[in-house]
Amino acid sequence: MDINRQKRYRRRRRRNDKGLICLLVFFAAAALVILNFCMKSPTSDDPDNTPGQNTVDRPVVEPNVPGNSNGSINADDWHLVLVNRWHALPEDWQPNLVPLDDGWEIDSRCYDSLVTMLDDCRSSGANPLICSAYRSQETQENLFSNQVSAFLAQGYSTGESEKLAANQIAIPGTSEHQLGLAVDIVDIDYQQLDEAQKHTPTQLWLAENSWRYGFILRYPNDKTELTGIVYEPWHYRYVGEEYAKDIYEKGVCLEEYLSGN
């Protein structure tokens, strides 16, 4: 092989090597993008929460809040029943439902407190609107199934779709809405389920006063690792006036309160 042919051969080989390196870099970058997408999980208990608005990593293991270790409270009190991704709805739970406006239902034990709270909120000049309350097992199953179908339509496998769906819709049996003691309230002039909701007149009033009526903000901004749910400034849970006052004054979530922290 003469010198010129050797030079041409080396140049072609360098070009081929560079092309191979670029190809490997491309596939590595693509793999990282896919992995990053799958690891991100906008955890919300509300199906109308737009994916990506609140993005956090879901807890992989149950947080260190054992449930009911606080000796000062009654672990069997229905006010404090814990339902989250680690504690499913009790099998014998049967809410006594009564109708609300717009077709929603709620447990009769918190009906009067809810109506009074909303009336007083309106008297302050705000315009609260209930956008979700009790959900049956069937309703929750349909919501979850629809979310799975949405991911299947995007090309994910069944297993991947179910995992991704669980990051956005509570698995049936683990949604607090199935208790009948939880309600989602928005401002009639701003009905988006995002963090901007907290700045509305309705949420400003509820954040300061809901505890007076036995309701707590169930998913505070800084408690996601404990609740398993991202910040939801619209989601309120009835626990009774005594417990609500105590939880509000301590600045804890329900999981912390039950653990005695």
Where are these regions (language model features)?
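Extracytoplasmic cell-surface/polysaccharide-interacting catalytic and binding patches
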Residues: D2-N261
